[in-house]
């Protein structure tokens, strides 16, 4: 959720300013979200295919070895003299989720940015505030409400996500989420009781999160 929101915040700050072709850039940023999930997942699977995928062709041309990004649980990575084990399939799915759903957060954040009165920023400039100070003390406090909403929504989306992961790799290599497990128990094993029990646990977790939001975050917003 944090990476998704930071990416959307950066994009919203960039396109908020007027520049040539801004409308076209805004439209292109919405493409991942409006693109059908079946088409998006298929394109990613083709690009990441270990045999004929374009990403692996680039890796081979750079002197690397072919990698099955969607079905390899982990991979060894050497960075600054340290050997790291990276959850490869999980990281790939997370990057796909960032790419696909950051336009959703982008729209929320951009709308809030455009609603902030320009007089605040102008007054800060007159007082000699730097761009960084204006962001931390004027812009960011105005965004806490929408960022908290996005966190709750994204957390809920992650728990309920089935189609993206199922189409990418079927939940293989450590990418299985609770909803995939529920579907597997229900359809694959016919274990209706276990599937229903897990679904109830999931619903309770989401209700607790929602109650926390309304009790603390939403109450603070109304007080302001």
Please annotate each region the language model reported.
Residues 1-224:
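A structural signal for multi-pass alpha-helical bundles of membrane permease subunits
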């Amino acid at each position: 959720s944090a990476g998704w929101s930071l990416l959307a915040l950066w994009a919203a700050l960039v396109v908020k300013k007027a520049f040539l072709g801004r409308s076209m850039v805004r439209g292109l940023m919405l493409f991942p979200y409006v693109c059908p999930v079946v088409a998006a997942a298929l394109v990613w699977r083709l690009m990441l295919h270990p045999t004929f995928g374009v990403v692996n062709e680039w890796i081979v041309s750079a002197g690397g070895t072919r990698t099955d990004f969607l079905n390899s649980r982990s991979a060894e990575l050497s960075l600054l003299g340290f050997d790291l084990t990276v959850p490869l399939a999980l990281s790939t799915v997370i990057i796909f989720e960032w790419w696909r759903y950051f336009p959703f957060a982008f729209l929320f954040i951009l709308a809030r940015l455009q609603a902030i009165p320009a007089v605040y920023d102008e007054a800060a400039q007159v007082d000699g505030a730097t761009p960084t100070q204006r962001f931390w003390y004027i812009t960011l406090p105005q965004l806490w409400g929408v960022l908290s909403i996005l966190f709750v929504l994204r957390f809920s989306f992650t728990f309920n996500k089935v189609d993206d992961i199922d189409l990418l790799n079927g939940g293989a290599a450590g990418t299985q989420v609770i909803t995939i497990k529920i579907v597997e128990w229900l359809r694959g094993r016919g274990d209706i009781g276990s599937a229903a029990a897990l679904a109830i646990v999931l619903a309770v977790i989401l209700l607790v999160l929602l109650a926390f939001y309304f009790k603390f975050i939403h109450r603070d917003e109304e007080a302001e």
